[in-house]
Amino acid sequence: LTFRDDFNQDIKGAISSSVTHLTFGNDFNQDIKGAIPSSVTHLTFGEEFEQSIYKNIPSSVTHLKLFSKFIKRKKEYIPQTVTNLISYDK
């Protein structure tokens, strides 16, 4: 499931438990606590995302893609279950 770059709405209860790949566009910056189903294994956030990921990413996520400025500030919050971490710039 991929959201457009201009999407920036609350996602709680909106994502199906059958989704395995979840990608948010550049403008998404909403609280994700309890919003990402445990079916998700691949997760991508856009450059504007600055919400807490600490204990908010399910342990099912093994592939995580984050904008580089986010990783520099909050690397210690990346779950240990993530085996593939990708940092990107514009």
Can you say where each PLM-predicted feature lies in the sequence?
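Leucine-rich repeat
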Residues: S16-H21, P37-H42, I57-H63, I78-N84
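Concave beta-strand-loop units of leucine-rich repeat
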Residues: L1-D10, T23-D31, T44-Q51, K65-R73, ...
